[in-house]
Amino acid sequence: MSITLSDSAAARVNTFLANRGKGFGLRLGVRTSGCSGMAYVLEFVDEPTAEDTVFEDKGVKVVVDGKSLQFLDGTQLDFVKEGLNEGFKFSNPNVKDECGCGESFHV
């Protein structure tokens, strides 16, 4: 089981955490949403729970809850800039289909 980050994603998360002034790492999860069923959730985490699995890559701790882990195993998080837009991009080998707008996915 693994969650990995690109160099640019790790740098961006570290910048966010430094600006925030505190935090254990980044929580990655999924929630029911959109036309394809699931959407990614990213948020800061100050302390993991007993049900969480913690991954570390490039100095960043990524926390995943037990329910989300089955859908996220093997995911790589990247941070990309495309024209005027920038944001995190998920490369998830478990995804079978995405909605047309890219906001949700199905495994």
UniProtKB/Swiss-Prot annotation:
Q: Keyword Iron: yes or no?
A: yes
The name under which this protein is listed is Iron-binding protein IscA
Supply the SUPFAM superfamilies for this chain. HesB-like domain (SSF89360)
What cofactor does this chain's UniProt record say it requires?
Answer: Fe cation
Q: Which UniProt keyword terms apply here?
A: Iron, Metal-binding
Record GO cellular component, one term: cytoplasm
The residues that hold Fe cation are C35, C99, C101
Q: Which organism is it from?
A: Salmonella typhimurium (strain LT2 / SGSC1412 / ATCC 700720)
Query: How does the cofactor attach, per the note?
Result: Binds 2 iron ions per dimer. The dimer may bind additional iron ions.
